[in-house]
């Protein structure tokens, strides 16, 4: 029998705390019965929710703390106030100590990133973490990163994102050599800022066996599934993510409005109900909730703070899959293949000289 996946939950994270975290984890448990949970936060509030979900209660342990990080706190403030005592820190610390395999939080993104770096540290050869998400496409799904961990990136960092993203794609999609594209304003080699053009030169020159670099991808290529992995720096990646989520909700609202406008449209909806449900499920941001913090010496999943139980369940699902399919080992194997490491990665100028 396979060992259970142990998931540490920041039960106080997000807009709704235990009222979403507990039922959300319970939904994920129905899909992955080989899971157990450690919940950190206000034990009274957590236990009130666990009493409503006996199956979840049977596989959960609660660790009490009165300290919770708010969504408004700056990372530096969160570290000063919540280090060693907050529900967010304790969930991460459980991963560091080996008591849990993955931490999941819907809390303050900046605080979670700062605490993750401070507590878990970075993998060898990686300077900065990235947030990667699974993006539904016309083709199937793609890994897109960075969607908000940091602003700006030089060529070397973009190349490291490509390597980490390809490792995640191999885990999720069972692809031996994922295709990787750099997000740009055009596909021509002369277009884009210098950092992106240098990253393209670097990836071509390295000719990595773990990935197939296909060049530049424009914004519309994300939804088309132009590559298995699409790489960008965090500022533009976060804008792209929020734009896509907003567009999905906008289209869903258009459909709802159109289908209820007249009696004919209502009858038409009845005939096409299953097709509309499939479309709605495909566009539902909750189905792909759960950003993976890549580059850390531990697995951390960030859920949207305002999601509901179904959305939080998706984030827990992502954490389960990252552990079950051994993401950290695959990233390390990629970075350290044949004794190499990203610290030996040349600059673009060195690589092409």
Curated annotation (Swiss-Prot):
One of its GO terms (cellular component) is cytoplasm. Its main location: cytoplasm. Keywords: Cytoplasm, Lipid biosynthesis, Lipid metabolism, Phospholipid biosynthesis, Phospholipid metabolism, Transferase. Its EC number is 2.3.1.274. One of its GO terms (molecular function) is phosphate:acyl-[acyl carrier protein] acyltransferase activity. It holds the Pfam family FA_synthesis. It catalyses: a fatty acyl-[ACP] + phosphate = an acyl phosphate + holo-[ACP]. Pathway: Lipid metabolism; phospholipid metabolism. Transmembrane segments: none annotated. SUPFAM superfamilies: Isocitrate/Isopropylmalate dehydrogenase-like. It is found in: Cytoplasm. GO terms for biological process: fatty acid biosynthetic process; phospholipid biosynthetic process. Catalyzes the reversible formation of acyl-phosphate (acyl-PO(4)) from acyl-[acyl-carrier-protein] (acyl-ACP). This enzyme utilizes acyl-ACP as fatty acyl donor, but not acyl-CoA. Homodimer. Probably interacts with PlsY. This is Phosphate acyltransferase.
């Amino acid at each position: 029998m396979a060992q259970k996946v142990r998931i540490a939950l920041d039960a106080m994270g997000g807009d709704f705390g235990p009222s979403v975290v507990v039922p959300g984890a319970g939904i994920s448990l129905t899909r992955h019965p080989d899971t157990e949970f450690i919940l950190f936060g206000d034990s009274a509030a957590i236990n009130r929710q666990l009493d409503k979900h006996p199956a979840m209660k049977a596989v959960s342990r609660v660790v009490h703390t009165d300290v919770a990080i708010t969504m408004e706190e700056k990372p530096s403030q969160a570290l000063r106030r919540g280090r060693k005592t907050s529900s967010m820190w304790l969930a991460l610390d459980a991963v560091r100590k080996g008591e849990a395999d993955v931490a999941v939080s819907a809390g303050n993104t900046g605080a979670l990133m700062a605490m993750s770096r401070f507590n878990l540290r970075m993998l060898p050869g990686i300077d900065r973490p990235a947030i990667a998400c699974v993006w539904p496409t016309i083709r199937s799904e793609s890994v897109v990163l960075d969607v908000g961990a940091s602003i700006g990136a030089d060529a070397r960092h973009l190349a490291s994102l490509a390597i980490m993203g390809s490792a995640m794609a191999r885990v999720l999609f069972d692809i031996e050599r994922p295709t990787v594209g750099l997000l740009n304003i055009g596909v021509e080699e002369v277009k884009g800022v210098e950092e992106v053009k240098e990253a393209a030169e670097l990836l071509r020159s390295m000719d990595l066996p773990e990935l197939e670099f296909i060049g530049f991808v424009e914004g519309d290529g994300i939804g088309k599934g132009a590559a298995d992995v699409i790489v960008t720096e965090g500022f533009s990646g976060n804008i792209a993510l929020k734009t896509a989520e907003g567009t999905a909700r906008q289209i869903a609202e258009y459909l709802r409005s159109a289908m209820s406008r007249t009696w004919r449209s209502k009858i038409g909806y009845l005939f096409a109900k299953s097709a509309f449900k499939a479309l709605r499920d495909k566009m539902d941001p909750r189905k792909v909730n759960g950003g993976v913090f890549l580059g850390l010496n531990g697995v951390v999943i960030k859920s949207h703070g305002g999601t509901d139980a179904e959305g939080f369940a998706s984030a827990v699902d992502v954490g389960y899959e990252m552990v079950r399919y051994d993401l950290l080992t695959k990233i390390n194997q990629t970075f350290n293949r044949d004794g190499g490491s990203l610290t030996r990665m040349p600059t673009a100028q060195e690589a092409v000289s």
